[in-house]
């Protein structure tokens, strides 16, 4: 699936350039209309100078008034917003043409499935569940107010018109560009989690009413063509969210915030369901005179009418001979009652409202069965099946919320509870990990409460326990689909998982004796050490009878989350990717040994440095046997609009992920290569990873690197941009890489065009393999190993985005002389990495194999470079003012933040 890093058009480039030029001309007219011709002249002058004479450009910008500088940045940024949306529209057009000529990706996947074992294919389809999980950080740098207007511009661009309508269309485009210019793209205040939730809900609402139904309808048809029926109760596509549930490092996410976000989601989810049911009511005019109905339908209708006095006598009279329409009216009333119940906080009343999506689906199934048995099969298995599958995909909650908390928070709360009991000879905090694991496993089997309610714990402990109580309350009020997974970040051992399980038991979420586990406990492995210990952690869990029982109660499925960001930040991209690949193999082997199905949750970022890149390729590059029909993948805030703003691209992205998961699960069940080849490649990757890791650690362990990083990038401005509700640094961390979260780490390098996390160390790794005389193995890996080819492709694309010519300007202007040796190290590794990657690909220049993407980057640079020059000039001014102890200039800060937004738009990502 395309991400912010790769979603570039491959359509006819001349048509694309013509449309970009058309919008660029309209933007020029907007600038003249709004600000006068002088601004347009200055924009063109700056663009020319940055290409021809960098020093003259820098000199000009150093003396530019702040207000003019801000307008300049806004002009270039607006150009990028318009160029981006034009590329998306053309990509959508191209996909439509390809679909018409060759069929969609699901059709091509269905053709491949004819080679699959029929029984295994049926099992895969039964278990099929692809879940994109929306996260908030780093939040889309463009505000929703801007995105709404860009969406309108996209719709106008995609409207086929004849010459007589062209003038009117251009007027509408110009109006919207004027509105974009007059809209403040900077957030005035940092968004609350509820604001972030509204941003995700905006996209989920659109998906609900469009792309998802198309994908599910196509999937059903293509599977039937491949000889497999998609079972009625299978949910092949669902959605998840972390917004409102991710409290790791975000003090703003309290139990109350979680509750408020769930209420907000349900308001939208129920409204979307009402819209679909209203549409159904319009269709279901089947008369009892011409089409019969089952006894089940008539009995359920009678029961509904008795319990729902709100149904108007008029409806009962008008629809007396239309039982299907009257049943749809009852379903609608139950949805309205559910909405009112949630708003008022009153208890669920069976038969009057819905407790979860399953009850809604059950009502619709009664209608579907009756239609099938009374000559209405075409509609039952067509439009109605589409409605049912779409409602099952989103549920009344729109997206299932994951809850995430740091492992230490659970131990902090449990320590107080165990120490209060005084049963152990040492304090909980002093216990070795192995001892603590046994203690917690024993406690999980026990039925006693650890503490009275409310528990005698401090404020942080109370907050942690409150989260579990909120989860329990949510399941009671909203139904079982609202929260399914509790994720433990920085999970280093089995005791971290047991700790969360014991607290869940305390809250009544798990009872092994009564035979229920209402949530699953999910370890998040996010550092290189944790990834290396993946099999040991899972083995320690599944070997324990109490935990194995918990997994059995969750359908014999164990979810494990793999974190790409932190492993890359601390180990470098090569070691991160390789250790994640190996961890998946080891997790697969342990899970299979215990008869457990593994659900991997990939915590991938939007950028290559945080695990990003095309999702479709990444899924197909997974080790054999690791996919068994289920996968979860994070959709980071900053790539959501790239993937889902344009309906055609939303459909394509979902189709790509579903198709890849289906293909990998059904066909990649055994090694594609011989054991000898795999052993040879593994040994080669060990050489590459070790050398790359050494080079990367040499860079990050340079004592001057933290200061160089802050000097050569605008990372200190990240907090002021109000991108998201989560702080960019860990509390009390100061100037250190350990204290900086992975997102601002990537953000800073990206803004200064160095993009170190996306490629650093790769050249040293590949060189080490060549020097070991393994050139032929390298070629073999690139030609035959999907994992390695995907890795090299992502690195090559990041190298093409990296621009050390621009980075040199940052360093020359902003970095003290005594720190410039760090940039020399970066330049040397960059030169080596480009050379080594070209050796592997056989190209003479980066992206020779993708000339359209290469050309796109070249065109973008002409508009991106001026923003970078402006950013350097403004950073210099701000730092000089700070050194002189002058009061911060709000206009300067604003202009600087506009450059940050502009570079993000130009490179199509924040972090």
From Swiss-Prot:
Instruction: Return the GO cellular component terms, semicolon-separated.
Output: cytosol
Among InterPro entries, the record links this protein to: PEP_COase, PEP_COase_bac/pln-type, PEP_COase_Lys_AS, PEPCASE_His_AS, Pyrv/PenolPyrv_kinase-like_dom
Note the superkingdom of the native organism: Bacteria
- Which keywords does this Swiss-Prot/TrEMBL entry list? Carbon dioxide fixation, Lyase, Magnesium
Catalytic reaction list: oxaloacetate + phosphate = phosphoenolpyruvate + hydrogencarbonate
Write down the Pfam families for this protein, in alphabetical order. PEPcase (PF00311)
Q: Does the keyword Lyase apply?
A: yes
The EC designation for this entry is 4.1.1.31
Question: What is the documented function of this protein?
Answer: Forms oxaloacetate, a four-carbon dicarboxylic acid source for the tricarboxylic acid cycle.
Q: Name the family the entry cites.
A: Belongs to the PEPCase type 1 family.
Protein's name according to its UniProt entry: Phosphoenolpyruvate carboxylase
Q: What is the lineage of its organism?
A: Bacteria, Bacillati, Actinomycetota, Actinomycetes, Kitasatosporales
